[in-house]
Amino acid sequence: MNKDMYVACDDGILNIRVGAIIMKDGKILMVGNDRDYLYSVGGRIKFGETAEEAVVREVLEETGVQMEIDRLGFVHEIYFYGDAPSKRNKLIYEISLIFYMKVPDAFAPVSESFMEGSSKEHLVWVSLDEDIPMY
């Protein structure tokens, strides 16, 4: 299996990921875990994989449903300090390619929770007018 697009740079990390905008009935599907913020369905691009292939794979892994891409929504870049144990206090530079997905009319995630490494994550529908902490 190919490695994630995650590169150690001096005392920091370069991370290249994809995110999916999955909207239905005025809500967007987000991911949560044991921390106090939510983030988009998605994950790291694997070396040798295109961003489009990565977002389709990540959506399938996290929702259990195969979806097509509608279009690239935007590119997001951010510097932040990691809070996971292996990345605590490391400066991370992250580039995210965020795609709008074509959501099937009868879409419902196969599972509401999944494992990402050793942490359990869960899917949350959030109203577009709701004020939430995001990552």
Regions found by a protein language model. Give the residues of each.
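Acidic, metal-coordinating catalytic segment for phosphate/diphosphate chemistry
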Residues: 1-19, 25, 88-90
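A short coil-to-beta-strand element that immediately follows conserved catalytic motifs
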Residues: 66-75
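A generic structural micro-feature
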Residues: 12-14, 87-95, 115-120
